Amino acid sequence: WKAERMGLSNDPYTPAQARIEAEGVIAREQSNGELLLSARRNRLIVEERLHVPMPGKHRFRKKTSWTFGIDNQDRDGFFIGRNLQPIEVARDFTLSLQPQFMVQRAINGQNTTISELFGLKAELKGQIWGWDTTWEADITTFKPQDLADGSRYWGNLENDFELPWLGDITARLFGAHRYRAWNGSLGETDIYAALGGFIEQRKTFDLGKSSNSYLWRLGLGNYQAERFSSVSLVDSMRANFYGSINSSYSIWRGKEAPMTPQKAYRYSPVAIVPGLTFDTNVNTLLAAYGDGTHQNTLSFSGGPTLTLGTFSQPFLDYTRVSMSGGVTLKQGSSPFNFDQAVDLSTLGIGITQQIVGPLLLNAGFDINVDAGSEFYGDVINSNIELSWQRRSYDFGIYFNPYEGIGGIRFRLHDFDFNGTGVPFMPYTPTNWMEMANTDRPF
């Protein structure tokens, strides 16, 4: 369709906190569902004060075009990335590219060559033989001598099936080269090669006042990864079963602010409801290895989450505090570093606090509290973020000291007005092994 003048906003209220104003507009919907706008004049207006000129062509996607990040391990600190327009390489495949420039490497490096200052993130998504497939590459240098050690690759093929008695399950075939993993007190560890597959099922259900979800996963693969307590590598088969149940029980639920743009939706696209819940996780991991060894764990973690205020007043009207303690029982030992259970007693604390207006501070950490462990007192995860949260957009600066990664993000919320998006995600402590085993691609 065409229009001489157009206004577009993701804010259902007037005045809109963020809107796009364009002249001489031609709009085309792409095959992947994205909307491509071409205009003679295009600008983003924020809070009716800030006018930001925009390109004549704009593609509405969930991620912003520019990325500002910190990666102390692979990129030597601060870097800038640019998300290019996706390329349709075939009828069923789309290639997304993000060239990167290593700013801090350029500033600090005395003998750095041009090829070391650039990197690339690439993602190829598509469908083959009815399977959804995603392949990703993370290249942090183009220096020929360092290209092999400066690149990481991983991908999978995924499909849904229905099995008798089990219902719908997901099957996934995976592969990885130099995959970057984290394992609590052991820190970063590389999986140099992985090839295998698994089936899994995820479900949610309510039981009385509790909301529950479960995951089970059965997998088999061959891994070449760093050996536990050694600098050498180990190559071995690994068969494993993982099961997890999360529950949240509502103890007290308050009343949200009136559903108006001056109250409940003053700063947030969702109404904040005061309350107290008790959250628990029970999980087990059974793993057998090609050398005849095995490792079995049974973990329990739980704790309260208290929400005070409705985030509708200009000062200290939203506080969210979470606390979680975890205990793990362990039998046997893994030959690998990436799945070795070492943090057998943990404590996590997270807090989100409104400072003034839409300014929020979000911080949290998990530590090892096993008095008999050599890692007693070690931080096994941490996060801190300062965000400017509005009904239709948010801006955040975040850093994870444990992983040494961080960044700056600006995001317009989804046009269906149904969530806060990233990075406004209050930190909730969780059992480390439960988190690590569900987030990995294998």
Label each residue range with its predicted role.
Residues 152-156, 176-198, 202, 217-246, ...:
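C-terminal, extended alpha-helical scaffolding domains
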Residues 21, 195, 382:
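Residues that flank catalytic or metal-binding motifs in active/ligand-binding sites
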Residues 169-171, 195:
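N-terminal lobe of the biotin/lipoate ligase/transferase fold
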Residues 1-167, 177-189, 341-345, 356-373, ...:
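Structural signature for solvent-exposed beta-strand/loop edge elements and short helix-capping sites
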Residues 211-217, 221, 226-228, 234-442:
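Exposed, low-structure sequence patches enriched in small/polar residues
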Residues 129, 163-166, 207, 270, ...:
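Short, aromatic- and cysteine-enriched interfacial helices/patches
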Residues 31-35, 209, 314:
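Short, solvent-exposed loop/turn segments that connect beta-strands within catalytic domains
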Residues 115-117, 140-142, 150-152, 187, ...:
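Acidic, Ser/Thr- and Pro/Gly-rich intrinsically disordered regions
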